[in-house]
Amino acid sequence: MRKRRPYVIVYVTSSVDGKIASRTGDSRLSCPHDLRRLHEVRASCDAVVVGANTVIRDDPSLTVRYVRGSNPIRVVIDGMLRSPLNAKLFTDGQARTVVYTSVLSPRGKVNELRKRGVDVYVLEPMNSSGTLSLTKVLEHLYEVVGARKVLVEGGGTLLWYFFKERLVDEVRITVSPYVIGGEEAISVVEGEGFSSREEWVKLRLKNVKLCECGNEVHIIYEVVRKRMIRELP
């Protein structure tokens, strides 16, 4: 029997060449209007999900600031618990924070986060690198945490695993008028990638909007499931 999971939205802002940050980690791509759009989506979701690299690189708060609305549950997927203890998510007390990690993570760090009121769930990893099954994470988010709609903001490695496990329902991407370039720059989706067209994740266009700034484009896609592919022209 297939277990239930939340509806998953991916929201990213990228350069024209598909990068979300430069090789030095500079990710300042969004205009004020795009930030407002992001926060509107954030406010509409029960939880917002990021990976360890985003916590380490950006130290985000993941709260709702540019629009009115409640803060979502902040979820960190960090199989080896590499996120620093002084990260805003663990210290600012702005919203509930949930961490999914593996049995390979330092026990002392798990205990310290729990003392601070962070909900830490320890799962069995899929490999020695601490990679977690996102399918199991989403099932837990639905059944135990109570999240029905979640927003995944990255980074590129986490997005790869979400797409690899076929867990994304909707993709929202803002294309910003920059070219970043570089093999070491961070792409929208990192990871090993799919090897053939049969494996690619197919999308269906739902909406295209010129940003109010006049220089960015916001695109909304829905992910096409196998049963839907036969219906497409």
What is each stretch, according to the model?
Residues 1-233:
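Enzymes that bind and transform nitrogen-containing heteroaromatic metabolites
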